[in-house]
Amino acid sequence: MEKAATVLGLTIVRIPVVATETVDWDAALKRAVAAKVQALVTAPMTANYDITDKLAAYATKYRLPFMHDVPQLARDALAVYGPDFEDIFRRAGHYVARILKGEKPAMMPIEEPREFRMIVNQKVAKALGLTLPYTIILRANEVIE
């Protein structure tokens, strides 16, 4: 992400989070607004899934594009790009079948996600006064109107 930001002339403002339960989100997000951020992007970590609604509400309040990596939580984000969890769960079933047939879990390779989903939200774009490029819309797996 750092390289891409540099190439595009962007600056990344980080809001470090160790444990979501102990973070004062209002203070953290106010720091982001004070830093004049122009978008919110969450890091791909499960700790962020519980606060997606809060981040989306904050992004809406301050008219910031919000992007994250959980396709199942796409309704309030401008864009989502992340692993296809349905595919991951199907793959998990294959692992279970292999274990039930006697294969040792310690000897099985770890798999990374094979499929990713991109969802763009035209409704959010319109509310923010943005027009999504046609090339992005064409690449999206789903477009929310």
What feature does the model see in each segment?
Residues 1-145:
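Short hydrophobic alpha-helices and adjacent helix-cap/hinge residues
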